[in-house]
Amino acid sequence: MKNLVLDNRFVHELPGDPNPSPDVRQVHGACYSRVMPTPVSAPHLIAWSPEVAALLGFDESDVRSPEFAAVFAGNALMPGMEPYAACYGGHQFGNWAGQLGDGRAITLGEAVTTRGDGHTGRWELQLKGAGPTPYSRHADGRAVLRSSIREFLCSEAMHHLGVPTTRALCLVGTGEKVVRDMFYDGRPKAEPGAVVCRVAPSFIRFGNFEIFTSRGDEALLTRLVDFTIARDFPELGGEPATRRAEWFCKVCERTARMIAQWMRVGFVHGVMNTDNMSILGLTIDYGPYGWIDNFDPGWTPNTTDAGGKRYRFGNQPHIAHWNLLQLANALYPVFGAAEPLHEGLDLYARVFDEENRRMLAAKLGFEAFGDEDATLVETLHALLTRAEVDMTIFFRGLASLDLEAPSIDPLRDAFYSAEKAAVAEPEMNSWLAAYTKRTKQERTPGDQRRVRMNAVNPRFVLRNYLAQEAIDAAEQGEYALVSELLDVMRHPYDEQPGRERFAARRPDWARNRAGCSMLSCSS
């Protein structure tokens, strides 16, 4: 198997925990703790991403070698790997939670890659489920196959949808059982274990900065800020104050663009705590996430959030801004002034508004989003919610609407209830007439309009029930559906004849099934 070129700047340039013990503890004055992955009994490759493997320089023979499974299950290290778990805190459901840290994620190192054109990349390789760390609290540091499949598939599905995200190299089974109480209801059971190798330029989170501010460690906070800028934002220069202000604006801008993309494809993160917010504006930590089936701005897949629905679909833009405010509060001791932080927060609002308008225009096939279009969108969203209409199928079908004879007929497959469709039909036809009138103002040829809309409205998304079907099969040792689902999600905007079933709306059996309509943080 090919070796990687590793340049582990995080552990070389920032202070680490001098205590080598993996015992759970509060870690002070350090950005990380060195820790070894815990070996497993029978590592075996379940699935892998060809694109991420190629990004790192691995070919298929590398990936299918026993050495590959051993390394990415945590049983062996490649030359130059220096495993560690990061120290961070976070606000969880709006409240400060103190030290959290990588409780079952272990970073192996930073791989440096060079493309044929000379462009270099830096990729942190992180194992999720590789055993206990000083930050594991009361947990075992392991992950179950169920949650690992969901993380692996969604990481790659989001990338191919065009949403900023961490990636996934591979999914490796451990041959061991992990005990989990899926809904914390006193009914634990043993489930198959697995390890996912996550890949990103950086796994630094908002919480990495918050922990040092909460402890009054301004010196280490400053070091981490300047390190992050130097490694992850090398294009920024100038005096420290200027560079830091530009950096915070970049973080706010990237976060805004990410959230707009979530809203475009109907993704609900489910647990937008500040420790789950990437400093690079990447979607990170795929836990109790879900995809909008029937359009509902008030829906959240996370049972832990079922009461307050803090992280519901329609509230995600607001929560991202709130999280950036917590980051701004954490950074204030370094900045020493509120103005550049306020500028970043204001920038988030402006960029999100611009990106959201651009996204809405694209989904509807408009060149630009005018102020008069807001009413059209508000009316549509209210109608989709009341009539229980599938978001993905509706917008995909809208591209094929006959503008000379607009009718609800080609959109009927998007309705979950025939009764609600019948009730909504007059109002829907009225909206379609208004939409047709607005669309004709564009003077865009029908074929061109269809191609443009189909490039932003996916045919395939990782619906919760599809992931659950793959999980059910994998738990019986059948992994073919995981691989097929990955392949489908690699081409979400293509028609893919013969794979229509992967574009079907949620079946009735999945409406209230665990893993399909409701999920927990148990993993």
UniProtKB/Swiss-Prot annotation:
Q: Which cofactor is recorded for it? A: Mg(2+); Mn(2+)
Q: Can you tell me which residues bind Mg(2+)?
A: 276, 285
What InterPro entries does the database record attribute to this sequence? Answer: SelO
Q: Where is the active site?
A: 275
Q: Which GO terms describe its molecular function?
A: AMPylase activity; ATP binding; magnesium ion binding
Tell me where on the tree of life, at the top rank, the source sits: Bacteria
* E.C. code: 2.7.7.-, 2.7.7.108
Catalytic activity entry: L-seryl-[protein] + ATP = 3-O-(5'-adenylyl)-L-seryl-[protein] + diphosphate; L-threonyl-[protein] + ATP = 3-O-(5'-adenylyl)-L-threonyl-[protein] + diphosphate; L-tyrosyl-[protein] + ATP = O-(5'-adenylyl)-L-tyrosyl-[protein] + diphosphate; L-histidyl-[protein] + UTP = N(tele)-(5'-uridylyl)-L-histidyl-[protein] + diphosphate
Q: Which Pfam families match?
A: SelO (PF02696)
- Binding of ATP, residues: 101, 103-104, 128, 140-141, 198, 205, 285
Record keywords: ATP-binding, Magnesium, Manganese, Metal-binding, Nucleotide-binding, Nucleotidyltransferase, Transferase
| HAMAP family attached to this UniProt entry | YdiU_SelO
Q: Which family does it belong to?
A: Belongs to the SELO family.
Q: What does this protein do?
A: Nucleotidyltransferase involved in the post-translational modification of proteins. It can catalyze the addition of adenosine monophosphate (AMP) or uridine monophosphate (UMP) to a protein, resulting in modifications known as AMPylation and UMPylation.
For this protein, the record's PANTHER family field holds:
PROTEIN ADENYLYLTRANSFERASE SELO, MITOCHONDRIAL
Instruction: State the protein's name.
Output: Protein nucleotidyltransferase YdiU
